[in-house]
């Protein structure tokens, strides 16, 4: 029988503190298998935590602190101490590690690995965003990504410049049924003919198009308009020069976003 139920049957409902947190049932001898009533003690959650902290039982402290709703930093520190206090780091034993890796690979191959559906990551990321600790929200990360994207756009290697990544992503979403084109709401606003073209791969957005100048291959009218007209080998493409930083041969979008009135050099004079 559950030790909490044993205590409740003998003493009634477990009381709550002023914050509405249910008190804890502590095993006096530290043996969770010994559920004798004389071995069970009802304590506040703070008292329970203090006992295990004094005993340097960091694993128990970590579990209790999660229930106490402490800050992520405090919980992380305790989790680290709990891991380091274990006599045997079982996951570092070569045989165990090899077995776990083989199991994960097998699950990935047969599609049963729990991280493949994305639901766990989605909830984890939403929680981190709510707490303000997601790496996308950190100034250092934002600056690094911005710098990398600027360089990629200038070199013409940014994923948005070629369309290959978007094309593969859209095809994947269509195949697994998660594309918004296939949602019930979108179906009400989209003709059956369009949906049929998407399913059989004949939609204009799925049609492969080759740049007339450099031979680069992309998909959809958008690729032709954005790449063909702006291709560096197109002699008739619009070329703009920034009057502040002397950068030349800029596309309209790059000029509008990073140069002209928005150029950093303009404010350094």
UniProtKB/Swiss-Prot annotation:
Pfam families: HNH_3
Keywords: Endonuclease, Hydrolase, Intron homing, Nuclease
CDD domains according to UniProt: HNHc (cd00085)
Biological process according to GO: intron homing
EC category: hydrolase
UniProt GO molecular function: endonuclease activity
UniProt-listed Enzyme Commission number(s): 3.1.-.-
Function: This endonuclease is specific to the nrdB gene splice junction and is involved in intron homing.
UniProt-recorded name of the protein: Intron-associated endonuclease 3
Native source organism of the sequence: Enterobacteria phage RB3
């Amino acid at each position: 029988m559950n030790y909490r139920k044993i205590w409740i049957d003998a003493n009634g409902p477990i009381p709550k503190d002023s914050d509405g947190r249910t008190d804890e049932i502590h095993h006096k001898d530290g043996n969770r298998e010994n559920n004798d009533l004389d071995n069970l003690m009802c304590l506040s959650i703070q008292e329970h935590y203090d006992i295990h902290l004094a005993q340097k039982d960091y694993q128990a402290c970590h579990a209790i602190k999660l229930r106490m709703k402490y800050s992520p930093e405090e919980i992380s520190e305790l989790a680290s101490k709990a891991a380091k206090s274990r006599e045997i780091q079982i996951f570092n034993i070569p045989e165990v590690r090899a077995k776990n890796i083989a199991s994960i690979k097998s699950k990935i191959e047969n599609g049963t690995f729990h991280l493949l559906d994305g639901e766990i990551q989605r909830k984890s990321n939403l929680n981190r965003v709510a707490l303000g600790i997601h790496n996308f929200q950190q100034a250092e990360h934002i600056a690094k990504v911005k710098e990398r994207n600027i360089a990629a756009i200038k070199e013409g290697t940014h994923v948005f410049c070629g369309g290959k990544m978007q094309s593969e992503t859209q095809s994947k979403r269509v195949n697994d049924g998660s594309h918004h084109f296939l949602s019930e709401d979108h179906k009400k606003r989209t003709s059956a003919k369009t949906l049929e073209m998407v399913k059989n791969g004949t939609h204009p957005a799925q049609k492969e198009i080759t740049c007339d100048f450099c031979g680069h291959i992309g998909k959809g009218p958008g690729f032709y308009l954005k790449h063909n007209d702006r291709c560096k080998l197109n002699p008739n493409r619009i070329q703009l020069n920034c009057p502040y930083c002397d950068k030349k041969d800029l596309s309209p979008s790059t000029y509008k976003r990073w140069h002209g009135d928005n150029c950093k050099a303009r404010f350094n004079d």
